[in-house]
Amino acid sequence: MNEEYVIQMKGIRKIYPNGVVANQDVDLNVRKGEIHALMGENGAGKSTLMKMLFGLEQPTEGEIYVNGEKVHLSSPNVAISKGIGMVHQHFLLVPSLTVAENIVLGMTPKKNGIFIDRQKAIKITEEYSKKFNLAVDPNARVVDIPVGMKQKVEILKALVRGAKILILDEPTAVLTTQETTELFKELKHLKEQGYTLIFISHKLNEIMEITDRLSILRGGKFMGVYETKDVTPEKISRLMVGRDVVLQVQKDVAKPTDEILRVRDLHYVNDWGKKMLNGVSLSVRKGEILGIAGVEGNGQKELVDMLFGLNKPNEGTITMKGDNIIGLNQRQLREKHISLVPEDRMLFGIAANASIEENIISDRADSKKMNKGLMFNMKNMHEETDALIKEYKVLCKSRDQKVGMLSGGNIQKVVVAREFSNQPDLIIADQPTRGIDVGATEFIRKKLVELSRSGIGVLLVSADLNEVMELSDSLIVMYGGQIVAYFEDTSQLNDEIMGQYMLGIKKQTAEEIARVCHE
């Protein structure tokens, strides 16, 4: 095989038992010491291809070579033994353990063969941290560290196990602009030391900045490999989706009217005794998108959980059109015409083993339209499901296909098809485009703007700073469980201004922040 490449995947085909073809004769050639992007829409076959490279799945056909040697990667342990490591999008860390304990987990050093040698674990962590310029606190509990440090812990875990080839799955999905900049410096340092990085991302600006070459998949097929410097973001988008993509949403000036959601003086202490919300107050009005920005872990999740009915505050009030909604369950919230797009679509957004139709109709199955006497009106159910599949461009075999068999982007389209189509007065959208491709992102962003301009109130929570600045009509920033800034006009904002508030460097006066209550 060609010694230029540390990874060669040749003629890879993956067909699942249900007949779904995830990869069709895909070739992937990765050079030593390069940062190589793997791109494609959700459902294009990227994840499947990387699962095979990391030994999580087996190809139906094809060959894999690592450093010129033909290999059978029957498990992650085999892949690790060949110098391959994977940093997953959703971190696989134990929150209650320290950074050092997480890094050596599974290969924990022992004293006298019995007791955990914590000092040695700390020493290993410090040694690798220094060697690779990945600054972490070995003694900190993972539950208490910021997201950016968790990312470094995951990378160190792979490096400690001898990885020379790192697969990075959406590594910046939950990072701030500053954390992303820092991560890129660290990745370039790894590259300079001869490490090879496979970088999976939907963020075209990052691909252009950090990668040397890129391979593109579409519909499970290999569309080509390119030198990054020779292509434009527009060309990449066309190769990924087969058409031009416009991520910058055109929107009219918002004309908000009545207050629809009122949150006042929310306080919440979590099970570890940490104060996660400290006097949060805000209002959402009809016809506007109110965005919430901030580094994850600063109270956004706790706030959204309360609005979703998953938790209750220790103090404070939440009302919808004047009615208290604290303590209401999901069904009762829907009766208040609140639609919910959860951050974790797999856990809270769908029933994976149910069909597309069952998932889409689940919130309206007891409506008059969907019932005929004591029986379901199957004709109306089929028609509504098919219409939404068409409108929201859900790529599927049929309405009867299990949702769990769809790609991430198409699962998200099923969620938003249900939530956006049920005549809501308020949409709470938590990370609505996280981990989905540019085509699905474009569609969902346009829909949110379209719905807000029809008079619906939208509360948008997003870790994607560009997204939250572009879509929001007004914007709050959360830090340390508090609102530290409110911007009534987002047109003059930039990453640098936002970053200062998101990292707690700056805070507006109480009077400036109070404007978000519109009283």
What do these predicted regions represent?
Residues 2-519:
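Glycine-rich phosphate-binding loops of nucleotide-dependent enzymes
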